[in-house]
Amino acid sequence: VTTVMETSDKVVYIYFTKNVSGISREASVDVRFTDGGAFSLHFCQHSYDDTIAIQRMWPELPTCPVDDNYIYNTHYGKLGIRSDARNYTYCFDIRNRASIWVAYPLHRDHMSGSGNRNNSDFGYDPDVEDNLQAALGLGSYNGWYDRGHQLPAADRKCSQQMMDQTFYSTNMTPQQYKFNQNKWGVLEGRVRNMTCNDTLYVVTGAYFGGQHHSSIDASTTDRKGNKCPTPTHYFKALLRTKSGNTGRRIDEITSANQLRAI
């Protein structure tokens, strides 16, 4: 651990070297200032793994393997008095022009507020190159396929900013319209019914490697003619505390008996 005091902005920067030891290591740092201020910091640094693209900063994230076809990203937005609350994290597969999973927290605070889907527009995710995404700002996928949200817009009424981010192409997959408007919508509602005083953590995923139902084409196109494969399966995985009223984060829970996975 090394520290550097930048006199220009009077900020103490703490730097860590890569941990190649094969085991986690910990360090405690006491910072004392001449004006009497003091802070104690404790760090736990996991061993570096060059097969993992990003370390899981949130407990519900799937493993994030390094793959040239995957783009990992997190969007942040306004939630209450916070301007930088996490909205969702995704793994975008450039081969399918879609995310294979979208992970997000869900609480009652996310589902009420000023966000209005009528004020949102479908469009490109600004953090991913346009040419890698489905062009959904021009309209839905061709054929009988809706622009199906992985993180539902109804789960982000907390602010217009968070609502708008759910309309990015990276949050969409081509869904057969009857499925999207019926069974998928029912499932989304059931997930919302699982919310509690503690945070519910959700991972929604699309799987492209199975056998298509006879009513589903192997692929469709967007309005620019780009090929967009259709998922063969979808899933939702949920994690929360059993009581729903612990007032603790998932990573603060010490016993698996206190958790509920669905």
Report the location of each language-model feature.
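Surface-exposed, short loops/turns at beta-strand junctions within beta-sandwich domains
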Residues: 17-24
